[in-house]
């Protein structure tokens, strides 16, 4: 399954690379990468080192393209605006490519897809999106989880947080009834917080692609990222990193990398 996804991603890159000309130079200086410190398995900090699927993949891409990276922690709610204004050269944090976000930043070719998990404490009566009515549901502001909740469970009481850790803390204390995270993040929280009696009650797989964000018009940097991504897919690095961080992630049959 993962080989199929890797192949599809690789095929999509051919068209994207052809469209990447040169404008703003990526340069030889260190690139500042805005990322998160608490969003497993995509982007998190462990023993003082930024890691996760997205960040390790970006490191491999950078090595292939001889790019230097400096990872800096931020909040997801402000990440894209910080890329847009040039505070960060790259945004790396399982960023879903939506039409609204493309108005603010440009994206690399897709390298993964969005999968969500509805997580709840025992005894809340939450089993799926239809049972969220009147419940206090935590989401990180500005994420696909936020927009998904508004579209699919408008009668739920959305409680917005700046980052995953704050939503998890509220869920553990009972300040909210449930939360929506990336599926793998939700499963990790449930496994590592047994006393909180958390459960991923429903997984929601989408075909929304993930991409690294760059400032609009920076086609040179986007082109370097895409060239490196193509290379690490071809040499098997993509699959190894994916297997390391998301070994059980389902791959939707209808997923098409590069779909806009």
Locations of regions flagged by a protein language model:
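A ligand-binding cleft/hinge motif common to bilobed small-molecule-binding domains
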Residues: 94-103, 150-151, 177-207
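Acidic, polar ligand-binding/catalytic clefts
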Residues: 68-131
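Extracytoplasmic small-molecule ligand-binding "clamshell" domains
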Residues: 26-94
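Extended ligand-binding regions for polar small-molecule ligands
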Residues: 21, 55-64, 143, 211-249
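C-terminal motif of bacterial Sec signal peptides marking the signal peptidase cleavage site
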Residues: 15-19
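Ligand-binding clefts/hinges and TM-proximal coupling segments of bilobed small-molecule sensing domains
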Residues: 22, 147-161, 198-200, 229-260
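Periplasmic-binding protein-like
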Residues: 112-120, 187, 191-227, 248-260
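Short helix-initiation/N-cap motifs at beta->coil->alpha
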Residues: 71-81, 124-125, 141-144, 159-169, ...
């Amino acid at each position: 399954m993962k080989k199929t996804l890797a192949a599809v991603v690789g095929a999509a890159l051919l068209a994207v690379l052809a469209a990447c000309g040169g404008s703003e130079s990526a340069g030889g200086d260190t690139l500042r990468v805005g990322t998160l410190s608490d969003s497993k398995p995509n982007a998190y900090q462990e023993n003082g080192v930024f890691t996760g699927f997205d960040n390790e993949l970006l490191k491999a891409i950078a090595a292939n393209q001889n790019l230097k990276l400096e990872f800096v922690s931020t909040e997801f709610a402000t990440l894209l605006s910080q890329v847009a204004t040039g505070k960060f050269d790259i945004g790396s944090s399982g960023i879903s490519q939506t039409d609204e976000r493309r108005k603010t930043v440009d994206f690399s070719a897709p390298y993964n897809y969005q999968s969500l998990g509805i997580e709840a404490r025992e005894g809340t009566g939450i089993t799926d999106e239809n049972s969220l009515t009147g419940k206090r549901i935590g989401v990180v502001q500005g994420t696909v989880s936020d927009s998904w909740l508004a579209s699919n469970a408008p009668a739920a009481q959305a409680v917005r947080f700046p980052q995953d850790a704050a939503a998890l803390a509220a869920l553990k204390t009972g300040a909210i009834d449930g939360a929506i995270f990336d599926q793998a993040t939700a499963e990790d929280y449930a496994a590592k917080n047994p006393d909180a009696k958390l459960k991923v009650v429903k997984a929601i797989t989408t075909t929304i692609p993930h991409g690294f964000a760059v400032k609009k018009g920076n086609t040179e940097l986007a082109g370097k990222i895409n060239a490196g991504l193509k290379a690490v897919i071809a040499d098997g690095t993509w699959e190894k990193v994916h297997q390391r961080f998301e070994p059980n992630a389902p791959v939707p049959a209808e997923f098409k990398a590069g779909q806009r």
